UniProtKB/Swiss-Prot annotation:
One of its GO terms (cellular component) is cytoplasm. The lineage of its organism: Bacteria, Bacillati, Bacillota, Bacilli, Lactobacillales. Keywords: ATP-binding, Cell cycle, Cell division, Cell shape, Cell wall biogenesis/degradation, Cytoplasm, Ligase, Nucleotide-binding, Peptidoglycan synthesis. It comes from Pediococcus pentosaceus (strain ATCC 25745 / CCUG 21536 / LMG 10740 / 183-1w). Belongs to the MurCDEF family. It is an enzyme of class 6 (ligase). One of its GO terms (molecular function) is UDP-N-acetylmuramoylalanine-D-glutamate ligase activity. The keyword Cytoplasm applies. This is UDP-N-acetylmuramoylalanine--D-glutamate ligase.
């Protein structure tokens, strides 16, 4: 395990616990830093508290004290990606000139492996997973890490120089990088998202583009070519640009023409052989194909992965067929674009379960995708009233309220007919009612399973 920065005896604040905060704190302790963990939530699992206490790692829980930096002579902050830079502790740190980094940045400081970074507004987890499956073999290992739910600092310590790390990087994570340098960076797409955190679209785009800021001419940027703005963004990189296009706009990378997927002049497979539904997954497949071909993976193995891959949990995840009704869990659809993608994946009648945290998005953009197939909308959460209005505009006559996702499932099943799709795709974050989108999706799955038990 390398270390590009001497952290011995350095006073380091880990801001925010969660899985990544715990992992970062343990790594810093291993590097002989003086570690202090701070989280505004005092109700942390006892086993985590004991894990840190057993290492002699100090904790301040229940608040973010304004004097925590001066009182502890903090020299470096490793922050949870969800904590905004407007947090008073971070405002104070910036005024004092204290370096603030994200957990993936810390991981990069000790990483021996080649790094492949994946970002984008939608499809990151699917692309990350596909790349890992394509690169992993009996001789070398490929690990996933980052926003996919596996702390980067955990993986960085166990992966060897012969291995590869495929890291899903959110805009929140990329806002806090300094030296992080992927050999291959993937930009899947960029839509207006998380503007409550980034404040402006320009800030959001700039944070996304941090994925390529340290790349050189010896590296690669795999980028979606189906939008002129994204083509312009490619001009910012020093890396070799490898485009992918579902519209067949380029033949210099991965692309689709007439239902066939190619890399440069080589036919890879038929698009309808991909094991997961939806046009967005053709796009995700093309991004993964481009990376795999840069890494010299055989076409046979690429095809084997794409034909057998069953999808990622909470991302248009097929749950069950109950009396001819198909249930899909798309809890990860925390923005409008993701729900648009989900709705376009189905041609059968859809009962949509939607709603969540109100981030003041323009929900009217959903109307063209509601009109063709959505027969009923069941709403919950802060955006419930706004969803009712756009459903009415879309000409949907059946619009119902529910208190939680579990109740929505019961209503949807009662109202459904054989052949219907019952889809959870909230077009909103979960934080008004649930800690995470995973918790929301798990409630959906459990509710479907309860229906099955009652049959």
């Amino acid at each position: 395990m390398k270390s590009v920065e001497d952290l011995e005896d350095k006073n380091v604040l880990v801001l925010g616990m969660a899985k990544s905060g715990i992992s970062a704190a343990l790594l810093l302790h291993r590097l002989r830093a003086n570690v202090l963990v701070n989280d505004a939530n005092a109700n942390q699992p006892q086993e985590l508290i004991e894990k840190l206490e057993n290492k002699g790692i100090r904790m301040v829980l229940g608040e973010h004290p304004t004097n925590i930096l001066s009182q502890n002579k903090i020299e470096l902050i490793v922050k949870n990606p969800g904590i905004p830079y407007t947090n008073p502790v971070l405002v104070d740190a910036q005024a004092r000139g204290i370096k603030i980094v994200s957990e993936p940045e810390l991981a990069y400081w000790v990483m021996d492996s080649e790094l492949i970074g994946v970002t984008g507004s939608n499809g990151k987890t699917t692309v990350t997973t596909l790349i890992q499956l394509m690169l992993d073999d009996n001789k070398k290992h490929a690990y996933v890490a980052g926003n996919i739910g596996v702390p980067a600092t955990t993986v960085a310590q166990k992966a060897t120089a012969e291995d590869k790390i495929v890291m899903e990087l959110s805009s929140f994570m990329l806002a806090g990088i300094d030296r992080l340098h992927p050999h291959i960076a993937v930009l899947n797409n960029i839509f207006a998202s998380h503007l409550d955190w980034h404040k402006t679209r320009e800030n959001y785009v700039n944070d996304k583009m941090n994925i390529t800021k340290n790349q050189t001419k010896d590296d690669f940027l795999v980028i979606n070519w189906d939008n002129t703005e994204w083509q312009e963004l490619a001009k910012r990189t020093q890396a070799k640009v490898v485009p992918f296009s579902r519209q067949g706009l380029t033949k210099s990378g991965a692309y689709e023409i007439e239902g066939k997927l190619y890399f440069k002049d080589e036919l890879i497979m038929e698009a309808d052989e991909i094991g997961i539904p939806g046009e967005q997954n053709v796009e995700n497949a093309l991004a993964a194909i481009a990376v795999a071909k840069i890494e010299k993976v055989s076409t046979a193995h690429i095809k084997q992965v794409l034909t057998t891959f069953g999808g990622v949990k909470h991302r248009i995840q097929y749950v069950e067929n109950l009396n001819g009704r198909q249930f899909y869990n798309d809890s990860k659809a925390t923005d409008i674009e993701a729900t648009q993608v989900a709705l376009r994946s189905f041609k059968k009648p859809v009962i949509l379960i939607a709603g969540g945290l109100d981030r003041h998005d323009d929900l009217d953009r959903l109307i063209p995708d509601l009109e063709p197939n959505v027969k009923e909308v069941i709403v919950n959460g802060e955006t419930a009233e706004k969803f009712k209005k756009i459903a009415q505009k879309a000409g949907i006559s059946v619009i119902k309220d529910s208190s939680r996702v579990s109740e929505s499932v019961e209503i949807a099943y009662q109202d459904s007919k054989e052949g219907d799709i019952i889809l959870l795709s909230p077009a909103a974050a979960s934080w008004d009612q649930y800690k995470t989108f995973e918790e929301r999706g798990d409630e959906f799955i459990a509710a479907v399973q309860n229906l099955h038990k009652g049959e």
